[in-house]
Regions:
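Catalytic cores and adjacent flexible loops of soluble metabolic enzymes
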Residues: 1-199
């Protein structure tokens, strides 16, 4: 058991916890660089490429948007610290931005694109690893996708229950175990409350 635990990597996803503040984003990154997390994950989007001004959540997205140039400096800082970086682009322009880092970073395919085979195959050409969300998938569907991707060991299937806070009683952990038995690499993600994680 101890040997298996040593192989577990922990990812800290910043998401929108910076509230659109570059200053807060920098502080979060500085704290995470000093922590024991393995990777730091960023969500990247270009506001005018992601949503139309008429979209009801446009202003909310505007309030949490960070310019790509700011991300560039911060990502380079993380890479210099030897922490791993995972980027999740939400539009084509952001994807092109992520490609500039090439194999230095990994990429997460957003749920809306997890059946976009061309995008996934392009990602495998440019990035170190490719994380693909499979929440809601059946084992047979994951197997078909894995086969289409030539059973690449650089593909990491990401499963999680995304309600907040996540109720661990609703999780299908046996699902992940079955995927591992089929020689697939897996990642678990949730929104567990820090207050009830050990209940």
């Amino acid at each position: 058991m101890e040997k298996n635990l040593k192989n577990i990597e922990f990812i800290a996803e910043i998401a929108s916890s910076h509230n659109g503040s570059i200053k807060i984003l920098r502080k979060l990154v500085e704290k995470l660089i000093l922590s024991n997390v393995t990777s730091i994950k960023f969500q990247i989007f270009k506001l005018n490429k992601l949503a139309h001004p008429s979209y009801k959540f446009f202003n909310a997205l505007k309030n949490i948007s960070i310019p790509s140039q700011a991300y560039k400096a911060i990502i380079n800082k993380v890479l210099k610290s030897k922490k791993k970086v995972i980027l999740e682009p939400f539009d084509n322009e952001s994807f092109e931005f992520c490609k500039k880092f090439k194999k230095k970073v990994s990429v997460k395919i957003s749920s809306s694109d997890n059946d976009n085979i061309d995008l996934i195959k392009t990602s495998l050409k440019y990035f170190d690893k490719v994380f693909i969300s499979i929440s809601g998938y059946k084992i047979s569907s994951v197997e078909k996708l894995f086969k289409k991707l030539n059973r690449s060991k650089r593909v990491i299937f990401t499963y999680g229950f995304q309600s907040f806070p996540t109720d661990y009683r609703n999780l299908r952990m046996g699902f992940l175990k079955e995927l591992k038995q089929k020689n697939m690499r897996v990642c678990y993600a949730d929104h567990t409350s820090r207050d009830n994680i050990f209940e």
